[in-house]
Regions:
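Non-globular sequence segments
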Residues: 1-106
Length: 106
């Protein structure tokens, strides 16, 4: 039962959550991809309409999560770059002096 595709998909979901908490976006996206693929395999193991509907919704969820994480990764990259730029600018004495002069009408 532990190797059933549905259980493995749930493991991949938990793994994706752990990766996301550590800002490992590519790994999280891969886990959601794996979960979605495993759910397709799980669909082949049942003929229950209710089970198929549930698995289909879960499959859709994992595909959407991949897209959402991709957006989060892009946003994280932009924010990180902006923070690095601010840090670099704050170390430049000419910019700091100019900023002080501008602030005092100078």
């Amino acid at each position: 039962m532990e190797t059933h595709p549905l259980n493995l998909a749930h493991q991949q979901h938990r793994r994706a959550d752990a990766h996301l908490k550590n800002s490992k976006f590519d790994e999280a996206m891969q886990c959601h991809h794996n979960a979605a693929e495993l759910l397709l395999d799980a669909m082949k193991t049942t003929s229950s309409t209710a089970a198929l509907e549930s698995i289909t919704l879960q499959h859709s969820y994992h595909l959407k999560q991949k897209d959402l994480i991709k957006s989060k990764k892009e946003q994280y990259t932009r924010v990180k770059k902006a923070m690095e730029n601010i840090k670099t600018l704050s170390k430049d004495p000419q910019i700091n002096t100019q900023g002080i002069a501008d602030a005092h009408g100078g």
